Amino acid sequence: DKLIGSCVWGAVNYTSNCNAECKRRGYKGGHCGSFANVNCWCET
């Protein structure tokens, strides 16, 4: 998967809707993951 940003408000590269942002970039979808679900990962 491709890390594109953060799911935490105020963090660097914050995205309010990880799945929608990933789709906008041409990925199949996305989800918040890693420690405490802080990162936005796009499905590759």
From Swiss-Prot:
Q: Which UniProt keywords apply?
A: Antimicrobial, Defensin, Disulfide bond, Fungicide, Immunity, Innate immunity, Secreted
**Example GO BP:** killing of cells of another organism
Location relative to the cell: Secreted
Give the disulfide map: 7-32, 18-40, 22-42
GO CC annotations?
Answer: extracellular region
Q: Which family does it belong to?
A: Belongs to the invertebrate defensin family. Type 2 subfamily.
This chain's function reads: Possesses potent anti-fungal activity.
What's this protein's name? Defensin ARD1
> Which organism is this protein's natural source?
Archaeoprepona demophon (One-spotted leafwing butterfly)
State the taxonomy lineage: Eukaryota, Metazoa, Ecdysozoa, Arthropoda, Hexapoda
